[in-house]
Amino acid sequence: MRVMAPLESSYQSTRLDANRQQTLNLFPNTLRGYRQFPGHVTFASFQSAGEALTDTNASAVTDSDGDPVQVSINPGGADRGLIADGPNGLLYQVTGSALYSIDSSGNALFIGEISNTPNPVVMAADATQLIITTGGTPDVYVYTVAAGLVVVTDDDLLTTSSVAFLDSRFIYQQPDGYFVVSALNDGATIATLDFAQAEALPDDLVRVFSLNQLLYLFGETTTEIWFTSGTGRPPLSRQAVLQQGICGTYAVDSIDATARVSAYSLHQENFVDFIFSDQGQIWCYHVTSQTWFEKDFMTTSIVHHYDLVLAAHSANKKIYRLDFANYQQDGANMTRRKDLPLISSEVMDVGGAEMVIDKIKLHVDA
């Protein structure tokens, strides 16, 4: 009996249409098998909910028909960004025009409103400050437990759409290839002299990003790497230049220190999601096997926090925990599909000879 392992990567055959090579919600896990992508179990919800509006006497306020007037207590919207380990060690999400903190039990607290919805935000945080950049007007907010949510109004900070945190300072993307560094431990204070320019090549600055104590300045065609040198204004120096850039502000993420991109680890498996929200598609790269598969549950932000992997849905105002003990998507059955490779005489090592296949046996663990 000839054993054919169905582990060949999909989307590579030139003899089949791409839509006949689909791998959906499955990824290679063992030498001869695939594993189901985990289910999505609700962790926190920002779906509109209502409670009766009451007057000063605790009596229900009614409309002209005598029905109680309801007020929204959990506003939410499209996922715009999710960040772990913000002030007080909490999880924070911008959902629609609302900023929420979420504790380890999934309880959410409304903090304030963020402009420029539904565009994604870029956030950075230390133990006491959460900085949110919108690319709109206002373009920068700072949240602290003591002072709440306020707009950053420093005249030395021009319009920005991304921020990073490095060595007790916040670094902001600026127009014309510039970036600016905040005061030590104060993301809302900018000094006039603390500007620098990514100037190795003339491509514009698309994103600032920190990783492994280095600052990455991503342009359209190049990337500059800077480090904290402690000298000069700002106290950073360029270390290297890479001849690759990125396609957009939200197309960068990291896995284990290494379109819109979200990267994450799950049960020692590494994944990178390439997200196309408008088309309702996610192409996922499984780093371990170096193969691709598709996902059909539209999550756009994924973080590790509270010893969980948490994913925010693109539109339904919920955050989910990924759970290998549950193979449903928000309570609905998950469709899984694996198109087998083309069975040909070449695969069976019989050249161009005619074949008759009497029996095919598949092993499926339900």
What do these predicted ranges mean?
Residues 1-109, 115-128, 240-366:
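Beta-sheet repeat architectures centered on beta-propellers
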Residues 51, 57, 66-78, 105-119, ...:
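Beta-propeller and closely related beta-pinwheel folds
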Residues 96, 135, 175, 220, ...:
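Short loop/turn segments immediately following the C-termini of beta-strands
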Residues 122-152, 172:
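Hydrophobic or amphipathic alpha-helical targeting/insertion segments
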